[in-house]
Amino acid sequence: MKKDTYNHVLKYTGLLGGVQVFYILMSIVRNKFTAMFIGAWGIGLVETYNRAVDLIANMTNFGIGFSAVRRLSELHEQGKEEAIRIYIRLIRSWALVTALFGTLICLLSAPLLSYWTLSDFHTTKGFVLVAPMVGILAITGGEVAILKGLQRLKQMAAISALGALVTMLLTIPGYWLLGLHGVIPVLLSTTAAVCLLNLYATTRDYPYRVGLRSMKLMKSGGHLLKLGGAYILAGTIGSGAELIVRSYVTNSTSLNRAGLYAVGVTLIVSYARLAFVAMDADFFPRLSAAGDDRKRRNNAINRQIDVLVLLMTPFLIAFALFLPIIVRVLYTSEFLPVVSMVLCGLSFMYFKAVYTPIAYLPLARGHSRLYLLMEFLYNVVFTVLVIVGYHVRGIVGAGIALSLANLFDLINISLVYARVYDFRFERRTLLRCIVQYALLVAGIGAATIANWGVKLLLGLPVLGLSLWFAWNLLRKKTNIVDKIKSVIGRKKQ
């Protein structure tokens, strides 16, 4: 049974993670040209717009993209085609309402957003122009919920890959031809392109229809708003925390430093996130299905932690060792100051790999208030630590603060959910986490050495040991060896 569980986790992490590798490759090319054409100042401006749009979107989408999935998934499993069509119409109707509402809120709050983020009203026009992004994101969220509810994982993977390609093809010429004047056109066009790709995928089987004039239909969607309440509040708190931090960095220094901070966060978070892509689409439904079965819940969580930690650690060690080269390749030498920040912040992703499967427990059990409380506590700690860290030691202090924030979340979640849900780390899982983290710390220590010969002499054996632990577990707990032999056998024929 355990072997089947490991195979299942690895399968869906591989399916969606493989797509994320392509997504990351496209992002690498896009970010390289973005850095060349608009520099750190331009990236700071892009991130300011994105964080503000995310905040308004999370405040106004009522969590429909999350709350609609469970009911649609149930209808899909029951094979009730007519009910599915009606429910999809309901999702789209409410998504359109929230799209219009969110766009209006962004338009009205444009002066406030400009003053809050940049301490003046000079970018009010910019926030007005990006307001349609809020509406487009709401519509996209509804279509993504439809794909998730219908369990179209392969379609979602294809859209993600194609979306990354289209985004790159729109971004590079946009910044090349227009420079900083291309920021808003690029943001709008890329957001719209991803939305159209999702609409194309869903409308092939379910043509786009809404029922805004049907009061009966609209009233039946009340549960969508209630179920998504905690999710939207948590998202708003998270987006608000990010915006507060980035506004502080901008206002206390400059958009240039905000751009460096944004790149540092991207390097810490974005390229390691492929390990998490199967969480919403695969792990969450399995955890929800466990219900009151404590043993089954704990087994699912521990298996997920095992896979995440063993995938994450070798990647982070390799990333740390070659980080100066990576920064030069992905961006320009202007961004080399972020190397120290990223090295200090890599533990952020490791701790996230450990606690994320545990953090899904209240959502899987329908305990929205507890989920919201935990998110609120984390974001308060995150905001305070990063602001203090940046104030004391600049972007390096911010990197240290990011790691400390997630260490706090790991300890807090583990203690609280052990009491509420009787969650327990399995002894072997806990031992794996400790060993792999010790290897990560050793790898980061080696990465701080300036001499490349000494750095690689000390760091590569650490990386090899981490890879050996990962391979040893996968060899014992999955049929990965048989699959590799099968692929090699087919190629020889």
Which stretches of residues belong to each language-model region?
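Hydrophobic transmembrane helix module of multi-pass membrane transport proteins
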Residues: 9, 13, 22, 93-243
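Transmembrane helical elements of multi-pass membrane transporters/channels
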Residues: 11-31, 43, 163, 187-194, ...
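Membrane-interface helix-loop junctions in multi-pass transport and translocation proteins
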Residues: 35-42, 151-154, 164-196, 200, ...
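Interfacial segments at transmembrane-helix termini and the short loops linking adjacent helices
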Residues: 110-130, 302, 320-350, 396
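Membrane-proximal transmembrane or re-entrant/amphipathic helices at the cytosolic face
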Residues: 445-493
